[in-house]
C-alpha cells in the first residue's frame, strides 16, 4: 500500500466558516482511519485600505476598510487511497479556499 503525506491549507475571510470546514475535514479523515495533525492556526493577514470620502477636498475626512484573511493547516502524515477518496467526496462551502499538497509515495 502506498502512503503519502498530505498538507491541506485552508483560507477564508470568515473564521467561523473556516473552522467548520476544518472540523469536517478532520472528522472525515478520522472516520477513514487517518492520523491527523491540526488544525494549525496561522496568523491572520489584515490588509487595510484608506480612501478619501470626497474627491478633491477635505483631506481629514477618510473612509477605512480592511480585509482579514484567516488560514489553517491540516496535516495527514500517513494517508492512503481510501482516505484520499473520502476527502475528495467531501463538500466544502464556497467561501473557503483549499490547497492540497501531496508529498511522497513510499511503500509502507
UniProtKB/Swiss-Prot annotation:
Biological process (GO), any one: translation
Keywords linked to the UniProt accession: Ribonucleoprotein, Ribosomal protein
A GO CC annotation given for this chain: ribosome
SUPFAM superfamilies (alphabetical): Ribosomal protein S10
Stored InterPro entries: Ribosomal_uS10, Ribosomal_uS10_dom, Ribosomal_uS10_dom_sf
Pfam families: Ribosomal_S10 (PF00338)
SMART domains, A to Z: Ribosomal_S10
GO molecular function: structural constituent of ribosome; tRNA binding
Residues of the signal peptide: none
Subunit structure: Part of the 30S ribosomal subunit.
HAMAP family: Ribosomal_uS10 (MF_00508)
Similarity comment text for this entry: Belongs to the universal ribosomal protein uS10 family.
Role played: Involved in the binding of tRNA to the ribosomes.
Name of the protein described by the UniProt record: Small ribosomal subunit protein uS10
Source organism of this protein record: Ehrlichia chaffeensis (strain ATCC CRL-10679 / Arkansas)
Gene name, Swiss-Prot/TrEMBL: rpsJ
Amino acid at each position: 500500500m502506498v502512503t503519502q503525506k498530505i498538507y491541506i491549507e485552508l483560507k477564508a475571510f470568515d473564521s467561523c466558516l473556516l473552522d467548520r470546514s476544518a472540523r469536517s475535514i478532520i472528522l472525515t479523515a478520522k472516520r477513514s482511519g487517518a492520523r491527523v495533525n491540526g488544525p494549525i492556526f496561522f496568523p491572520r493577514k489584515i490588509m487595510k485600505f484608506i480612501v478619501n470620502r470626497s474627491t478633491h477636498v477635505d483631506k481629514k475626512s477618510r473612509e477605512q476598510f480592511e480585509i482579514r484573511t484567516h488560514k489553517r493547516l491540516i496535516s495527514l502524515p500517513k494517508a492512503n487511497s481510501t482516505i484520499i477518496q473520502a476527502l475528495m467526496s467531501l463538500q466544502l462551502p464556497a467561501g473557503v479556499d483549499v490547497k492540497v499538497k501531496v508529498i511522497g509515495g513510499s511503500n509502507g
